[in-house]
Amino acid sequence: MDSTMMPHTIRQNTIFGKTNFAQQKLGLYQVVAPASPVCSRPGSSCSQPPTLLGNNPGVLTPTGSLSPSSFKPAIMLETEFGDNPYYPSTPPLSTSGSAVGSPKSCDILQTPLNPMFSGLDGFSGVKSGFESIESSILSWTSCDSPPMTPVYIYSQPSRVPSLSSTTSDLSNIPCPSLSPSPAPYARSVSSENDVDFCDPRNLTVSCTSNPSLSDFTLDCLIEEDSSCSEQGSIDTSVIVQPTFDFSPAIASGLPAFEDFSDFESDNELSSLVKSGGVYRPRACTGSSVVSLGHGSFIGEEDFSLDENETLRFPSPSPPSIKPVDNSHKGKRRKKSSEDTRSVEPVMNTAATAADESQTVEVEQSDRASPAPSESNSSAGADTPSAPLPAPTNRRGRKQSLTEDPSKTFVCDLCNRRFRRQEHLKRHYRSLHTQEKPFECNECGKKFSRSDNLAQHARTHASGGAIVMNLIDNVDPSAYDAGVVAPPSVDDHANYGKVLFQIASEVPGSASELSSEEASDNGKKKRKRSD
């Protein structure tokens, strides 16, 4: 007995131990745990609770499957997905007969229109290319379909009777059409079900939503021909117009567009339809295109200072002020005449005292007595015109002989124009006065320009070249950055007269007179060994 009962006792003790452990572990579920196996297994383990608790899968599986109440709605939603399809609480939109970019008579596109753009087809400027065609199709008097019903535009309710009085079929519409186009179907597909749609009779109509035919045609077809609207042709003047003429009284938040100021011309056009009257800018007219262009009146000296850093363009005197002419040719003449008049004050303000005397005397000898200067010549003048330009092939560097207004400094002897004052003074020394104040220290060769001396000094090994004066009675303080001043006023007056007659007698002699020196020559002449 003891040996046979011992395993049972041990087994019972083990089971009781597990039972106590399970009761301590489950804690709050001690009352609930025996109830579920009793219902599922009524005949096997109800009589012996230890044997019932000893069946571990039978006890622990129902206990473990007991979950908190928060997970129960998840199981409920998973089972109801395929069993209970339902409509959304918001009434769905009905299918309209058109979309934004399609004509109103198209029955194929059934995409509902965005309620933000409802009622825009009646405004001027929107779909203006189709207005002439649609005006005959959408005639309110011959329209058998339900009337145009713009939705979601909240405005005065006083317009509702005028909309409902246009036709007797308003009560037959079960759902609204969000486009102003007539709905091709009396009832939509989704309206067959018992779903509550909004009643279009309770909707308000905007003040700009074309309640009548006259309002519809006067806004967008006021400038079109009546024949074009009847025949269905598209007017190009309406298509070209890119401006939107939205009324600011729309309550749906649409912005009121205005004309762009960038497209306005000088005469302030009201619209771009009359684009044929737009004038070109004054700088782009035919005369200026053939001539110097936009920057012709602005030279390089306007943006850079001279070495002397003086005011290059003084204020004009009262006699030099003239009324501005509208023609560009006269404007250029005025500029060139001002340049010739302003040579004297520019030379006076920017040069030294000796340079002032040289320029004044040369100009006076040129303007006061051009004919006597010719009569003083020893050989006699052959040409009647005194100021003759120098040959174009005189210099290696290309110099324009045209009357460029940007070149404000003019030579009085040869009418050559320069952009900078130092260029004009260098021109006087090298060509007209034949001054050579720069002498090489090695070979003793003299030059009229310092850059020519520096170029020549590279040929010598030592490179020694100093600046020496050619004339004895010259004050050393007269040197200004390598520029030598002439000795006296009388000599400069004689220089101007003699050189003026030389230039008038032999026009081609200017290049031969200055060819011995390397002043301003091309690269081929500057590479000479002598």
UniProtKB/Swiss-Prot annotation:
Record note on disruption phenotype: Increases the yeast-to-hypha transition rate, enhances conidiation capacity and aggravates pigmentation. Leads to sensitivity to stress. Significantly reduces microsclerotia formation and decreases virulence levels.
InterPro entries: Znf_C2H2_sf (IPR036236), Znf_C2H2_type (IPR013087)
Protein location: Nucleus; Cytoplasm
Stated role: Transcription factor that acts as a key downstream transcription factor in the HOG1-MAPK pathway. Plays crucial roles in the regulation of dimorphism transition, aggravated pigmentation, conidiation, microsclerotia formation and subsequent virulence towards Spodoptera litura larvae. More specifically regulates the expression of genes involved in antioxidation, pigment biosynthesis and ion transport and storage.
Keywords: Cytoplasm, Metal-binding, Nucleus, Repeat, Transcription, Transcription regulation, Virulence, Zinc, Zinc-finger
Gene Ontology terms for molecular function: DNA-binding transcription factor activity, RNA polymerase II-specific; RNA polymerase II transcription regulatory region sequence-specific DNA binding; zinc ion binding
The protein's name in its UniProt record: C2H2-type transcription factor MSN2
UniProt zinc finger (C2H2-type) residues: 409-437, 438-465
CC annotations in GO: nucleus
